[in-house]
């Protein structure tokens, strides 16, 4: 199993190109199931999760062709996928595939919308009553789908097609909003989604669906209106840049020191995180090519942050910020309001010598003068990259194990950091 070795102490200087957003690319690929024509997606990141979703879509009979780089593309230019769901041969998504990635459950929406039936395995590890899929099922039922759960599978049927409805989510849900928008695009009549998620990735998917002939307004606000259409057609769409990758590398620069241009980044996608970084002592400069992040000489200042849905501070940057705050001059406080059990990285950060205490959903980080390299283990995607950030400023060698988590969400992370001067390498085997 691959590992990443890091010897800390080097500043970061150079340019890091920002990849396409995983959290937009996955639902965009799934949306291709809504039409029998070809959807062309540009700037799709090369990630393990994208490759897995290609397998899942292939199971339904979807043909996917990955085009090579075009003249003038930079080294990390995202791939172009030509996705054709001309014929759907199977409306069942089996457990062995869905269990590996929760987002793959979303195929239920376009399948029941277009084929009027779907059988999709519950994602792995879902306890009855606290399942994240409950809100997704509620949305489909509001649109007229008949839902049964049998043998670990959700079976959705809509013999006469889906019908527009008002869907009021009891809490903001990104996955629920994606599912509701995709399903409603082909429903008969008007659908109104209240308390919709406002994330940029929701807007990106809605923009693509509108290019395909959907009639969606209000994406990016808490109320989305969808006028259903009978058929969607093919289109070409460029995946927006990854705001979580942008924030991650910005925090890496703030941790290690130096100055890095984040090429292609869009500051409006993560303003709350950039404001926190400025408060922590980083210098953020917006320019025509993206964002320049610098920390030259100044120490790291402590911050108090609460995660929140967009446009608040994203939960997907919480672990990275915690790593940065381990070196702050004073006590920082981070409260997690979006997900339970999202402090699994605390135990591993402690192996560097970090001082972190937990009280419910709030972590208090007492900054230390130095971190020391250590063997550490990645527990999930965002936690894994927080360990890399800590290692960049730690004395000595750090070995990060179980980096398959990293490969799910960060495209060639070690190459991008190495190009800016980090002493980092992937060790195979």
Curated annotation (Swiss-Prot):
InterPro entries to which the protein is assigned, alphabetical: Enolpyruvate_Tfrase_dom, Enolpyruvate_Tfrase_sf, MurA_subfamily, RNA3'P_cycl/enolpyr_Trfase_a/b, UDP_GlcNAc_COvinyl_MurA
Binding site for phosphoenolpyruvate: 22-23
Catalysed reactions listed for this entry: phosphoenolpyruvate + UDP-N-acetyl-alpha-D-glucosamine = UDP-N-acetyl-3-O-(1-carboxyvinyl)-alpha-D-glucosamine + phosphate
Cell compartment(s), UniProt: Cytoplasm
EC number: 2.5.1.7
Pfam families: EPSP_synthase
PTM-bearing positions, type 2-(S-cysteinyl)pyruvic acid O-phosphothioketal: 126
EC class (word): transferase
Active site (catalytic residues): 126
Main location: cytoplasm
Record pathway: Cell wall biogenesis; peptidoglycan biosynthesis
Molecular function GO terms recorded: UDP-N-acetylglucosamine 1-carboxyvinyltransferase activity
Keywords: Cell cycle, Cell division, Cell shape, Cell wall biogenesis/degradation, Cytoplasm, Peptidoglycan synthesis, Pyruvate, Transferase
CDD domains listed in its UniProt record: UdpNAET
Gene Ontology CC annotations of this record: cytoplasm
Residues the entry annotates as binding UDP-N-acetyl-alpha-D-glucosamine: 102, 131-135, 316, 338
Function: Cell wall formation. Adds enolpyruvyl to UDP-N-acetylglucosamine.
Alphabetized NCBIfam families for the sequence: murA, PRK09369.1
Recorded family membership: Belongs to the EPSP synthase family. MurA subfamily.
PANTHER family, A to Z: UDP-N-ACETYLGLUCOSAMINE 1-CARBOXYVINYLTRANSFERASE (PTHR43783:SF1)
Protein name per UniProt: UDP-N-acetylglucosamine 1-carboxyvinyltransferase
Native organism: Rhodopseudomonas palustris (strain TIE-1)
The gene coding this protein: murA
């Amino acid at each position: 199993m691959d590992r990443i070795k890091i010897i800390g102490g080097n500043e970061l200087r150079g340019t890091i190109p920002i990849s396409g957003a995983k959290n937009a690319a996955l639902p965009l690929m799934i949306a291709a199931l809504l039409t029998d024509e070809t959807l062309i997606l540009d700037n799709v990141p090369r990630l393990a999760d994208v490759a897995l979703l290609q397998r899942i879509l292939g199971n339904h009979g979807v043909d996917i062709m990955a085009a090579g780089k075009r003249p003038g593309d930079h080294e990390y230019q995202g791939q172009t996928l030509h996705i054709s769901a001309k014929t759907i041969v199977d409306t069942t998504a089996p457990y062995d595939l869905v269990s590996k990635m929760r987002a793959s459950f979303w195929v239920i929406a376009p399948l029941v919308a277009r084929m009027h039936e779907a059988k999709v395995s519950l994602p792995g590890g879902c306890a009855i009553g606290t399942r994240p899929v409950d809100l997704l099922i509620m949305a489909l039922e509001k649109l007229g789908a008949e839902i049964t759960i049998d043998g670990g599978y959700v079976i959705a049927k809509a013999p006469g097609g889906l019908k527009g409805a008002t869907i009021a989510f009891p809490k903001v849900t990104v996955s629920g909003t994606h599912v509701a928008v995709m399903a409603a695009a082909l429903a008969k009549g008007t659908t109104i989604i209240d308390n919709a998620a406002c994330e940029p990735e929701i807007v990106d998917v809605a923009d693509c669906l509108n290019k395909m002939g959907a009639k969606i307004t209000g994406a990016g606000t808490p109320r989305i209106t969808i006028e259903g259409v009978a058929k969607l057609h093919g289109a070409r769409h460029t995946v927006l840049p990854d705001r979580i990758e942008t924030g991650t590398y910005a925090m890496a620069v703030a941790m290690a020191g130096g100055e890095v241009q984040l090429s292609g980044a869009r500051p409006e996608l993560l303003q709350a995180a950039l404001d926190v970084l400025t408060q922590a002592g980083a210098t953020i400069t917006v320019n025509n090519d993206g964002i320049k992040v610098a920390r030259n000489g100044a120490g790291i200042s402590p911050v108090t942050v609460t995660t929140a849905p967009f446009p608040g501070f994203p939960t997907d940057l919480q672990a990275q910020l915690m790593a940065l705050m381990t070196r702050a001059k004073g006590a920082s406080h981070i409260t997690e309001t979006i997900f339970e059990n999202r402090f699994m990285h605390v135990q591993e950060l402690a192996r560097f010598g970090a001082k972190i205490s937990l009280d419910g959903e709030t972590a208090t980080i007492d900054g230390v003068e130095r971190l020391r390299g250590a063997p550490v283990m990645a527990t999930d995607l965002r936690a894994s990259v927080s360990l890399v950030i800590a290692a960049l400023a730690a004395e000595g060698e750090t070995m990060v194990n179980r980096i398959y988590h990293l490969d799910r969400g960060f495209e060639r992370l070690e190459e991008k950091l190495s190009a800016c001067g980090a002493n980092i390498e992937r060790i195979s085997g």
